Curated annotation (Swiss-Prot):
Domain of life: Eukaryota
Principal localisation: secreted
Primary gene name: Ucn2
Positions of post-translational Valine amide modification: 110
Biased composition (Low complexity): 37-61
Family under the similarity heading: Belongs to the sauvagine/corticotropin-releasing factor/urotensin I family.
Protein name in UniProt: Urocortin-2
Amino acid sequence: MMTRWALVVFVVLMLDRILFVPGTPIPTFQLLPQNSLETTPSSVTSESSSGTTTGPSASWSNSKASPYLDTRVILSLDVPIGLLRILLEQARYKAARNQAATNAQILAHVGRR
């Protein structure tokens, strides 16, 4: 169950777009305004709907269906890497358990001879 949840979170973060419920328009994780221009591209942090913005976010900002659809969550790359590490550790533990079970079956079969 935890693996599925972590995978869902990872996929959502990789899509770089989260749709919030109308009651919660403020993202949980967000860079401070004074740092946003220095650390992220202007097409992501631009809040104006001017025609000079290029890229895929320009079409989204010009056609706002509702105010909460344009909310973006900006995270550092450490978060997805951390989630990948968790998923990798879980896969290693599962593989080790499977190998131990296989070894136990082999030893039980050899012990019967």
